[in-house]
């Protein structure tokens, strides 16, 4: 198995990316990596050589500030575009990048290509829950506007991922809404609710945002605008809560003593709520796995994104999505 990696994408690239690659090579004997980026820079950060790591030179980089579509069209020799081409031309089975999210979605859609029958791809991270099991949220920004039929496909794709990668035999699929009652919400959610009831997924109804971290469902579907707001609210809230805890536990001598006693448990809680432990955000609906690692990814986060991409390839997620979407259309 070979995964192409954008070595130049992300706030901590290329060092964090390369360190994450080295960690994954040590962990998985079947994994081969193509590092795409400036060859001289990459080789200067490689701590050791491996016959399972190949470097593909790219003399351009898509910056975070670049307009996504224009950048993909104009920067043909960028690390991200060449990475996607490795997958499109069957030299790699999957790809990951911590770079420009919009550009990666554009490259995935127009270079890697969309699965036949998929109307709109969806960007889907796995987010933490109190239990530590996590839940899949899609879409978080691939499409800010969506139709009910799109959300139904999100439910199917998310269900496949949860079953094949997370090992959940019958994933619970919930619809993010302002209330749990069937008739709650706007036209989009009301129509989506009716359609999801008719599918083969294990649809458990509407789910309110306040219940997400309690594990109300394994897969949560929503439009990209709502999903992105939800994602950033959860991220921001978690960071603020940990900051408040830190400020409180360092405010006096007595609280500092308490902090010393509580530190192992606090670190355990922080690790449980760290979304990077679950990998990156997958772009579902494409012919091969495309994974977006967080822009601030360190080596550990890159490793988990690679682990996730490897699992998606091993479990034939794209093929299962194509088959189940086809079956659903046949049943209509």
From Swiss-Prot:
GO terms for molecular function: phosphate:acyl-[acyl carrier protein] acyltransferase activity. It catalyses: a fatty acyl-[ACP] + phosphate = an acyl phosphate + holo-[ACP]. It is found in: Cytoplasm. The keyword Mitochondrion does not apply. GO terms for biological process: fatty acid biosynthetic process; phospholipid biosynthetic process. Belongs to the PlsX family. Catalyzes the reversible formation of acyl-phosphate (acyl-PO(4)) from acyl-[acyl-carrier-protein] (acyl-ACP). This enzyme utilizes acyl-ACP as fatty acyl donor, but not acyl-CoA. This is Phosphate acyltransferase. It comes from Bacillus velezensis (strain DSM 23117 / BGSC 10A6 / LMG 26770 / FZB42) (Bacillus amyloliquefaciens subsp. plantarum).
């Amino acid at each position: 198995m070979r995964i192409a990696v954008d070595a130049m994408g992300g706030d901590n690239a290329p060092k964090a990316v390369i360190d994450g690659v080295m960690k994954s090579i040590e962990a998985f004997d079947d994994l081969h990596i193509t590092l795409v980026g400036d060859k001289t820079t990459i080789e200067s950060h490689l701590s050791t050589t491996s016959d399972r790591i190949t470097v593909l030179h790219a003399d351009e980089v898509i910056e975070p500030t670049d307009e996504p579509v224009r950048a993909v069209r104009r920067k043909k020799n960028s690390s991200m575009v060449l990475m996607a081409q490795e997958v499109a031309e069957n030299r790699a089975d999957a790809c990951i990048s911590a770079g420009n999210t919009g550009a990666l979605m554009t490259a995935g859609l127009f270079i890697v290509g969309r699965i036949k029958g998929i109307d709109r791809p969806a960007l889907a991270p796995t987010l933490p829950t109190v239990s530590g099991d996590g839940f899949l949220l899609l879409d978080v920004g691939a499409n800010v506007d969506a139709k009910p039929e799109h959300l139904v496909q999100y439910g199917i794709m998310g269900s496949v991922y949860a079953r094949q990668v997370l090992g959940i035999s019958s994933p619970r699929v919930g619809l993010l809404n302002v209330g749990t009652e069937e008739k709650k919400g706007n036209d989009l959610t009301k129509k989506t609710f009716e359609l999801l009831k008719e599918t083969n997924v294990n649809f458990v109804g509407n789910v309110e945002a306040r219940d997400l971290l309690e594990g109300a469902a394994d897969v949560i579907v929503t439009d990209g605008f709502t999903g992105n707001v939800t994602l950033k609210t959860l991220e921001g809230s978690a960071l603020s809560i940990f900051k408040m805890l830190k400020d409180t536990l360092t405010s006096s001598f007595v609280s500092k003593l308490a902090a010393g006693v509580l530190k192992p448990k606090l670190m355990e809680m922080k690790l449980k709520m760290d979304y990077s432990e679950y990998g990156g955000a997958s772009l579902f609906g494409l012919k091969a796995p495309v994974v977006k690692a967080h822009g601030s990814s360190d080596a550990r986060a890159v490793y988990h994104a690679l682990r996730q991409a490897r699992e998606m390839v091993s479990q034939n997620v794209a093929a299962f999505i194509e088959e189940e979407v086809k079956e659903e259309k046949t049943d209509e």
